Amino acid sequence: MDYVTLGRTEIKVCKNGFGALPIQRISFDSAKEILLHAYNSGINFFDTARFYTDSEEKIGYALSDVRDKIYIATKTAAQNADDFWKDLNTSLNNMKTDYIDIYQFHNPSFCPKPNDGTGLYEAMLEAKAQGKIRFIGLTNHRLAVAQEAIDSGLYDTIQFPFCYLATDKDIAIVENCKKNNLGFIAMKGLSGGLITNSAAAYAFMAQYDNVPVSYTHLRAHETRRHL
């Protein structure tokens, strides 16, 4: 299993991360079996979101006993500080943990910054000061927002769609993250199932030594076959 260091966080994660969106569609016991199989196969990075219904609860159900051996990233789509704290505390409770390794703004239409009127980034800083989160991340599908986050110097990680269908502008996001020592996390490594040649997809990703992939495209019952 190959590992990647996420920029200045110094978090070392396996090249293949576990995107936990699909496990919301299966039972708790089935999810536990898959999650533990992933962990026992060497996967140490699990990415979920408050928006993914019971995905966080299933991670807590399956992995709480090995919490100190894994890295968890989750996300909030909150639009204000009050909802931010509700999401964060719910996520902590769901996953049976007192901290989140990477807490991410979930595909916002803008790049949250201090004094932007939302209170979101200030809430992130307070959560970090309280020890509830370790690092601050942002996920996005918009080139302009992702690049603004990189340029801002406010973020530790960026999660962005990336696969062998990537444009030159997409590749520039990856390169700019490396240049600025930000962790880059690829999502949609098989373009949501559009790419069926997994060997070619892996070969493309192997060109980039700073890119782990959070695979969320798999139907949950197929996940074990691909680990």
Where are the regions that the model predicts?
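N-terminal binding-site loop/beta-alpha segment at the start of enzyme catalytic domains
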Residues: 1-70
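Short catalytic-loop micro-motif centered on adjacent basic/acidic residues
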Residues: 44-50, 73-74, 134-137, 157-160, ...
